[in-house]
Amino acid sequence: VESRLNFFGNPLAGKVLKHINSANKVIADSTLPAATQELVKIRSSQINGCGFCTDMHTKDATHAGETQQRLNLVAAWREATVFTDAERAALELTEQGTRIADAAGGVTDEAW
């Protein structure tokens, strides 16, 4: 899969990558289980329409032991019964936080 944004060929893109990496480090150092972290990364990549990122995070999740069934159902997590309540809460927050441009209200207090 080919990246749509050349992070190394554009100085602004490099700054964006630096902030993304900083955010990823905060998440990686948190108490959020690794499996949930990967589900969140996959879902946000799907929402953003980034095939490169979706592919990368799906491979990372597989390597970490995630099942194919659960990976297949990330996009339909609301209807799927294979996710825990905690994972569903993380996916809801991801959904609302990633779709900030789509909704003037941003993340609801309830999801937060």
Role assignments for model-derived ranges:
Residues 1-112:
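Hydrophobic alpha-helical segments
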